Amino acid sequence: AVNSEVGVITSNADNARLTSFGADGNPIYVAVNYNKPADCITGGDTHAAADIICYMNGYSDPRREKYFTQSEWPGQTYVGFRRGIVIPPLASVGRKYSGVNISISSPVTWMNAAEVAFLKAEAKGVFGFNMGSGEAKDFYDEGIRLSFEEWGVSGADTYLANTTGKPQLYADPANSNSYAQELSDITIAWDEGATPAQMQERIITQKWIANWQLGNEAWADYRRTGYPRLMPATEDGNKSLGVVDSELGARRMPY
């Protein structure tokens, strides 16, 4: 594809998006607000996941204000809802977690230039494929810069130079579902001395962050690579009767 005369998506102007909907509007917005009770102001029973907020908080990621609503927990601007738990009462507890920052008219992205850049980075850095001119680091950095541009935030240079930031530990402000283990020790800045596995984790983690709201793509990458590293479902939160592994999560959808 990269050698085709047609080429691939390389700029945000060419992103594949849906911008016109029916009367209900953006379908992700509809899903987020499904079963929205009057006393749950951040949207039904859907909230931003603790995993991605732990990564982005640890990385001091400026895209947070574009992705999430601020939480109602004192002293915690962004705090996510852990997946695979027994849902607490929405009116008194659940409503306090960060929600999804989306409107009824927000466009739905199907594929973006950032994803293409990360695909090139993985192909070159992990598998050694010929991606034309450019090294894995070039494509990786480009993916992050394109994502920052897509979401209208500055600070990509500072973000790319961060060699120490790591995902924060998850301390549930409700004191119910904290996770004491480190999610990952992967940092942001590219490391030419990294192993292929470390390169892949770094690329997929940033691709996952950049592909916010592209859930099918994130799920496909997670099943394919095991990245990003996520929190397991809690023992009482896994209601699959042993069908779904709490560590791995769902691998397929039954028909």
Predicted features along the sequence, with ranges:
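Structured, solvent-exposed acidic/aromatic patches
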Residues: 1-155, 193-201, 206
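C-terminal functional modules
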Residues: 148-255
